[in-house]
Each structure stands twice: as structure tokens, then as C-alpha cells.
């Protein structure tokens, strides 16, 4: 049935959350408080306040996150989505993830709602750098400013352009597929609802129930995302 929806859709949007990344082995953000960080709340470290007032702790935390992302990579689900994009079956990927795995697998049209750990920029002048600077223990810009990941921290404004594009894509969607998101973070969790209100079929693939399951045309909770996407590819 979903294969038919995919082939019949003129505009398909994929929306991915933490569950997409954890299938690659990457711990989710909320699980980041292990080891050295066990006594810390990640949401407090990942804040503009910590960057401004406790920069060493901030850099230590994010260097570890950058190194962790570089240990892992895309799984079969990422590659299937990239292939579907090439085939014209997927028209937009909207992601809450910051690991860059969609782009690494070959997807071109990716809207990152919360930024990316693959890039850094200077907090003072805005100059962009690769995250390899953190790996090589380089934490300052040529101007002397602090290098920080190009992600949205707690206490910062959300990226208006990425969100507006995501809202526009949701309005156009015939098929909207949620992969691995609990749909509890606002305003990102409004995006699937916009698609549904504009006539899209809504599919939610997530291990745990979400607040929007009641609006979905289909929910899947007993399959891993990669297996689910592979099963669709193998249909027919």
C-alpha cells in the first residue's frame, strides 16, 4: 500500500528524527549524558548561556559529540532515501538531526531544522569552518573568536528559512512520512500536521507512540526504519 502511495505521490516529504540516527549506532542527544557527562543535563550544556559563560565545558561536550558522529555513518535507510530522491520519488527531506548522514548518503534536498555538527562557525565574525577543527583541537577563529558547531542551541532563534521551507513543503505534500521522531518538539512537530491538513497521506514510523498517531493514515512501530524502507523497495 505504501509503495503505491509513494509511486502515486507528486510530492513526497520525509521527516526524520533521532530514531533515524540511532539506527546508525549514534546515541541520541538525550543519551549523551553518559561517562563524563553523566551528572550533567545535556540541554543545559547545549545552550547559548554555557557557550557564553563556560566555554571550556561547552567545547569539551561538543568535541565529544563531533567525534561520536565521525565514528558512525549512514545506514541502509539513508541510502534508500537518497536512491528514491534520484528516482524522483522523494522531493524533500526535513530533519531534526544534526549528524549530516542524509547528505553523506547522497541526498541533496535536505532541510536541517536544528543545524549541523559537520560545520563550525566563529561566534564573533561568522566565518565557517569544518568540524575537523574540533577533532584537531582547534577552537578559535583567525580573528580570535570561539568556534562553535553550526547547530541551534537552547536559547537561540530557530532558523526561519529552514522552517519556512519545511512548512511550504508540507503544504505541497501528497505523502508525508515521519521516520523516527517522537513529534514532541515544537514547532517542528507542527509540520506533519500541516501536511495532513492540506490533504497529504501521513505515515508515522516510530518505536513509541506519538501525539499525532491519531491523525496518521498508517503507523508502524514494529519495524526498524531501515527494514521498513527496504521492505517498500523490495515490494513488487
Swiss-Prot record:
Binding site for nicotinamide: 29, 98-99
Domain of life: Bacteria
Cofactor binding summary note: Binds 1 zinc ion per subunit.
Subcellular localization(s) per the UniProt record: Cytoplasm
GO MF terms, alphabetically ordered: histone deacetylase activity, NAD-dependent; NAD+ binding; zinc ion binding
Coiled coil: none
Binding site for NAD(+): 18, 22, 29-30, 96, 98-99, 114, 181-182, 206, 225
Residue positions binding Zn(2+): 122, 125, 141, 143
Cofactor: Zn(2+)
UniProt keyword Lyase, yes or no: no
EC assignment: 2.3.1.286
Gene3D superfamilies, sorted: SIR2/SIRT2 'Small Domain, TPP-binding domain
Gene Ontology cellular component annotations, sorted alphabetically: cytoplasm
Residue numbers annotated as active site: 114
Keyword list, A-Z: Cytoplasm, Metal-binding, NAD, Transferase, Zinc
InterPro entries in the record: DHS-like_NAD/FAD-binding_dom, NAD-dep_sirtuin_deacylases, Sirtuin, Sirtuin_cat_small_dom_sf, Sirtuin_class_U, Ssirtuin_cat_dom
Catalytic activity entry: N(6)-acetyl-L-lysyl-[protein] + NAD(+) + H2O = 2''-O-acetyl-ADP-D-ribose + nicotinamide + L-lysyl-[protein]
Residue span, Deacetylase sirtuin-type domain: 1-236
Pfam families attached to this UniProt entry: SIR2
Function: NAD-dependent protein deacetylase which modulates the activities of several enzymes which are inactive in their acetylated form.
Classification via PANTHER family: NAD-DEPENDENT PROTEIN DEACYLASE, NAD-DEPENDENT PROTEIN DEACYLASE SIRTUIN-5, MITOCHONDRIAL-RELATED
Family the entry assigns: Belongs to the sirtuin family. Class U subfamily.
Protein name as annotated: NAD-dependent protein deacetylase
Amino acid at each position: 500500500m505504501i509503495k503505491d502511495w509513494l509511486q502515486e505521490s507528486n510530492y513526497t516529504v520525509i521527516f526524520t528524527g533521532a530514531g533515524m540516527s540511532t539506527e546508525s549506532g549514534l546515541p541520541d542527544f538525550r543519551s549523551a549524558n553518559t561517562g563524563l557527562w553523566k551528572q550533567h543535563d545535556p540541554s543545559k550544556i547545549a545552550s547559548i548561556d554555557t557557550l557564553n559563560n563556560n566555554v571550556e565545558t561547552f567545547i569539551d561536550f561538543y568535541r565529544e559529540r563531533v567525534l561520536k558522529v565521525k565514528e558512525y555513518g549512514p545506514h541502509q535507510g539513508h541510502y534508500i532515501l537518497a536512491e528514491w530522491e534520484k528516482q524522483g520519488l522523494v522531493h524533500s527531506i526535513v530533519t531534526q538531526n544534526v549528524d549530516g548522514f542524509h547528505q553523506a548518503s547522497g541526498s541533496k534536498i535536505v532541510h536541517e531544522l536544528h543545524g549541523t555538527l559537520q560545520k563550525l562557525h566563529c561566534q564573533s565574525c561568522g566565518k565557517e569552518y569544518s568540524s575537523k577543527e574540533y577533532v584537531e583541537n582547534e577552537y578559535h577563529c583567525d580573528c580570535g573568536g570561539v568556534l562553535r558547531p553550526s547547530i541551534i542551541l537552547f536559547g537561540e532563534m530557530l532558523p526561519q528559512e529552514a522552517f519556512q521551507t519545511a512548512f511550504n513543503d508540507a503544504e505541497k505534500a501528497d505523502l508525508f512520512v515521519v521516520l523516527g521522531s517522537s513529534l514532541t518538539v515544537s514547532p517542528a512537530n507542527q509540520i506533519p500536521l500541516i501536511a495532513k491538513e492540506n490533504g497529504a497521506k501521513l505515515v508515522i514510523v516510530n518505536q513509541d507512540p506519538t501525539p499525532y498517531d491519531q491523525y496518521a493514515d498508517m503507523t508502524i512501530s514494529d519495524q526498524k526504519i531501515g527494514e521498513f524502507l527496504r521492505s517498500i523497495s523490495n515490494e513488487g
